[in-house]
Amino acid sequence: MTQESFQHHQLCNCTILTEEWEAILQAISVGKYSWACVLMLHTAGYNPLTYIPYRTYIRLLKNNSMPDTIKTRKLQHIGAKFVAIKIKMMELD
């Protein structure tokens, strides 16, 4: 295994807040597993559109509400600016 591939598979160095865990666990407890995955990806700092089809992601956003703590963290993450713009546009509709 080379050094490059090792660095690629390292776990993210992120802290998950209590409110974020509660939102993820609540989604799991009511059977919204796809939404829990979206919340987990946002919390870890990943862009869900990398892993979830666009139409599925938009449907999940329309049917669920993103907790404020995850919204704030997502907006601070540089790679998630496009997603934030999409959410703002959906809120205006």
UniProtKB/Swiss-Prot annotation:
Keywords assigned: Heterocyst
Family matches, as InterPro entries: HetP-like
Domain of life: Bacteria
GO biological process, one term: heterocyst development
Disruption phenotype: Single deletion, no change in heterocyst differentiation, in a double hetP-asl1930 deletion no heterocysts appear before 48 hours, by 120 hours only 3% heterocysts form. A triple asl1930-alr2902-alr3234 deletion makes 50% more heterocysts than wild-type (although they are not active for N(2) fixation), while a quadruple hetP-asl1930-alr2902-alr3234 deletion has delayed development but makes wild-type levels of N(2)-fixing heterocysts by 72 hours.
Stimuli inducing this protein: Transcription is up-regulated by 6 hours after nitrogen stepdown and continues to rise for at least 24 hours.
Family: Belongs to the HetP family.
Its biological purpose: Delays heterocyst differentiation and commitment when nitrogen is limiting. Interplay between the 4 HetP paralogs controls the timing of commitment to heterocyst formation and its duration. Epistatic analysis show that the 3 paralogs act upstream of hetP to delay commitment (asl1930, alr3234) or inhibit development (alr2902). Asl1930 and Alr3234 must also attenuate the activity of Alr2902. Ectopic expression partially complements a hetP deletion.
Additional record remark: In Nostoc filaments, approximately every 10th vegetative cell terminally differentiates into a heterocyst specialized for nitrogen fixation under nitrogen deficiency.
Domain note: The N-terminus (residues 1-68) complements a hetP deletion for heterocyst formation but only partially restores nitrogenase activity; it does not bypass the requirement for heterocyst differentiation master regulator hetR.
Quaternary organization: In bacterial two-hybrid assays interacts robustly with Alr3234 and weakly with itself, HetP, Alr2902 and HetR.
Name assigned to this protein: HetP-like commitment protein Asl1930
Lineage: Bacteria, Bacillati, Cyanobacteriota, Cyanophyceae, Nostocales
